[in-house]
Swiss-Prot record:
Monomer. It comes from Buchnera aphidicola subsp. Baizongia pistaciae (strain Bp). GO terms for molecular function: ATP binding; glutamate-tRNA ligase activity; tRNA binding; zinc ion binding. Belongs to the class-I aminoacyl-tRNA synthetase family. Glutamate--tRNA ligase type 1 subfamily. PANTHER family: GLUTAMATE--TRNA LIGASE, GLUTAMATE--TRNA LIGASE, MITOCHONDRIAL-RELATED. It comes from the Bacteria. This is Glutamate--tRNA ligase. Its main location: cytoplasm. It is an enzyme of class 6 (ligase). The gene is gltX. One of its GO terms (biological process) is glutamyl-tRNA aminoacylation.
Length: 472
């Protein structure tokens, strides 16, 4: 038997970190068992589903490296097929037309709640005779068994049993003729020979209903594994209201690497000893469904930042270059050449946690000129600053060899000649050429800028200082 798992997102919103964790677990399990991973787009909700979200889901899965063996399949392409199956189920007495109005169902619900009962459909139309039909509008409901129970062994949570009397007759086709999620997913899992359904714990209540439909169709029952929720750092349900990044697109724009995200996400509910850093091959080797936690996991931004900086400094140069190219292009920064990007990683990688932070700092290298911050200039520059910058300009003007060693030697000799502290000289130069108070090694920054741009920045700073008033 070939192990087959699936990831079945609905394109009604951005790809969510919790959804990606589910996809990753399903992908890892399939790979660990030499099985297949299926991508299925559940787009029957035509009002909320969009092509833009579909493209975003597919692009982000590809970016993460979660490639699928089959698909993507689209439920919207199979609507007529689902309807034909439902028609046959009605003819076989496995489903029936329900003519109850929304008003009647609402009154029924309120009445049941007033009696302290769990609200569910009372099956009025299940035994309806033709002469009593007063409407042409209807939904189609599945004939759920009256007696017995549904028992399944969840690979994460163990044995789960639900009495059939607790379940109502599920709507499997809406009044507009569109089959419902709970029906389509069953047919797809059957037709695609899905052996293991790995999904969020919010689907546990759907499972007995889906099993009953599968049994009615004499189909094989897959093995289920319901993973726990992902919560915010303050243990709340993920929401835009708590200012938590939740979509993969947002993480990407913020400069997180796919390698660090996967490493971070896999640990939200799974572990292997005390190991923190996992390659994809190690994830596949060690992953089991039984090792997943039952309890919810909380996001940890500090952990993600730590992982991201690790991967920025340890990924192969060709890989990090590709990701930096994307980040620079997104920010409309025209970098000189690809070799520049690798120099930037070496220059800034140990100081910053995300690619976006590297890009933001790098603007000072690529902007035509520095937009000086008046507060920084007035706080850190004084009457000696003009003298320092003039000295540096004159010293570097005729320099023919441009490398870190030569720059360092010339900078040290300038400090000696000025008889001003190295700290003061370096701060003045740093602000003049980058606009920042902090920077990586100053000699490396000067070398990266190049002679012409470095001298131009010094001249611009001198011009700015000329118009400043210092206390005597």
């Amino acid at each position: 038997m070939i192990i087959k798992t699936r990831f079945a997102p609905s394109p009604t919103g951005p790809l969510h970190i919790g959804s990606v964790r589910t996809a990753l677990y399903a992908w890892l399990f399939a790979k660990s068992m030499n099985g297949k991973f299926v991508l299925r787009i559940e787009d029957t909700d035509k009002r909320r589903s969009t092509n833009a979200f579909t493209s975003e889901i597919i692009n982000n899965l590809e970016w993460l490296g979660l490639n699928w063996d089959e698909g993507p399949y689209f439920q919207s392409d199979r609507l007529e097929y689902y309807r034909n199956i439902i028609k046959k189920m009605v003819e076989a007495g496995l489903a029936y037309k329900c003519y109850c109005t929304n008003d009647r169902l609402l009154k029924l619900r309120k009445f049941q709640i007033s009696l302290g009962k769990k609200p569910k459909y009372d099956r009025k139309c299940r035994y309806l005779v033709k002469k009593d039909i007063l409407s042409t509008d209807y939904v189609i409901r599945f004939c759920n068994p009256d007696f017995g129970c549904v028992t399944f062994c969840d690979k994460i949570r163990g044995k789960i049993s639900i009495e059939n009397k607790e379940l109502d007759d599920l709507v499997i086709q809406r009044a507009d003729g569109i089959p419902t999620y709970n029906f389509c997913v069953v047919i797809d899992d059957r037709d695609m020979n899905i052996t293991h359904v790995i999904r969020g714990e919010d689907h546990i209540s759907n499972t007995p209903r889906q099993i009953n439909i599968l049994r009615a169709l004499n189909a094989n029952i897959p093995i289920y594994a319901h993973v726990s929720m992902v919560l915010s750092e303050d243990k709340q349900k993920l929401s835009k209201r708590n200012n938590t990044i939740t979509s993969i697109s947002e993480y990407r724009l913020c400069g997180y690497l796919p390698e660090s995200l996967l490493n971070y996400i896999v640990r939200l509910g799974w572990s292997h000893g005390n190991q923190e850093i996992f390659s994809i091959s190690e994830m596949i080797k060690y992953f089991t469904l039984e090792s997943l936690n039952k309890s919810s996991s909380c996001l940890n931004k500090k952990k993600l930042l730590w992982l991201n900086r690790f991967y920025i400094n340890n990924l192969p140069e060709t890989v990090i270059k590709k990701h930096l190219q994307y980040q620079f292009n997104k920010n409309n920064i025209d970098y000189k050449n690809d070799s520049d990007l690798l120099k930037l990683v070496k220059l800034l990688g140990s100081r910053y946690y995300t690619l976006q932070e590297i890009v933001d700092y790098s603007r000072c290298f690529y902007n035509k000129s520095i937009c000086f911050n008046s507060n920084i200039m007035s706080k850190h520059l004084d009457n000696s600053s003009k003298l320092i910058l003039k000295k540096i300009y004159d010293k570097f003007l005729d320099l023919e060899v441009w490398n870190v060693e030569v720059i360092r030697s010339l900078l040290n000799s300038s400090v000696c000649e000025l008889q001003i502290s190295f700290k003061k000289v370096s701060m003045t130069i740093r602000i003049a050429v980058t606009g920042h108070v902090f920077s990586p090694n100053l000699c490396s920054v000067i070398c990266f800028l190049g002679k012409n741009k470095f001298l131009l920045r010094i001249k611009e700073a001198l011009l700015y200082i000329k118009n400043m008033c210092f206390e005597v």
